């Protein structure tokens, strides 16, 4: 049986840090679903459809990645996708407490759902979508932190 994992997030937009995590996840699992949350309460810069398209382009080189948008409860989404693993990125110790709460709630809702925490490579450990957008808004150079297609889309949004 294939081991299916979900890497959920808002990915507004997807960064090279996210690509680092999903790339390493593809080496551990047979099939990785990059699950892009609608997250309307976060007021994303990019629509769900735009985020899905950007992520599909940025992960096209990874043969066992599927990009899907969702707005369901994570445990329900995982059950519907026949996935038993959630991949979560941890940039800093500060992320751990919140991630632990999520992991426990998800396990309560779906006991067979395991959370696997991956640290980004050192090069990406300090970046987030929010930080990249903020730097770009102030004309800072963010080309190193984003896939090329995402960088172009971000610059177009900010123009």
Swiss-Prot record:
The record marks 18 as: Transition state stabilizer. GO terms for cellular component: cytoplasm. InterPro entries: Cyt_trans-like (IPR004821), PPAT (IPR001980), Rossmann-like_a/b/a_fold (IPR014729). One of its GO terms (biological process) is coenzyme A biosynthetic process. Pathway: Cofactor biosynthesis; coenzyme A biosynthesis; CoA from (R)-pantothenate: step 4/5. GO terms for molecular function: ATP binding; identical protein binding; pantetheine-phosphate adenylyltransferase activity. It holds the Pfam family CTP_transf_like. Optimum pH is 6.9. Keywords: ATP-binding, Coenzyme A biosynthesis, Cytoplasm, Magnesium, Nucleotide-binding, Nucleotidyltransferase, Transferase. The keyword Cytoplasm applies. Its EC number is 2.7.7.3. The keyword Acyltransferase does not apply. It catalyses: (R)-4'-phosphopantetheine + ATP + H(+) = 3'-dephospho-CoA + diphosphate. It comes from the Bacteria. Its main location: cytoplasm. Its cofactor is Mg(2+). Belongs to the bacterial CoaD family. Reversibly transfers an adenylyl group from ATP to 4'-phosphopantetheine, yielding dephospho-CoA (dPCoA) and pyrophosphate. CoA is not a substrate for the enzyme. This is Phosphopantetheine adenylyltransferase.
